[in-house]
């Protein structure tokens, strides 16, 4: 993993390190002078190496596609579900925020909490007058630098009809004629 220059004493990394695999190393470095064998002196020092994480991992959703059902007529703010992604980077490189990535996000009657990933309804949705299915692209973005890494999942929300409308008689006037003796 490491090498040391015998001339300068400079410590070098021999191959790339990955903070997700191992983030700390403890080395013992020993210097020996060039005196005759019986007169040589040496000194040792313990060197601790902390590997600083870089933003080298994308967030990963537990599921990349999911379909759920949501009852019509639920009030605004009703919880739909929570999406969850993980990022194996550490610190801000692994801290995630969520958003709806659809271009028409303003028209979608759902919102996602940027911190928790909880999806909620923005308004009451009516099966008879609104769309019956919504396709959301949910994005998880890390807070990494120099650039953010992201991943998306597709969430399909199908609206379920509930029994909220009375039956209606289509013909209000009905004339019945009976001849005597038929009843």
Residue ranges with predicted function:
Residues 1-183:
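Extracellular cadherin-type adhesion modules in metazoan precursor proteins
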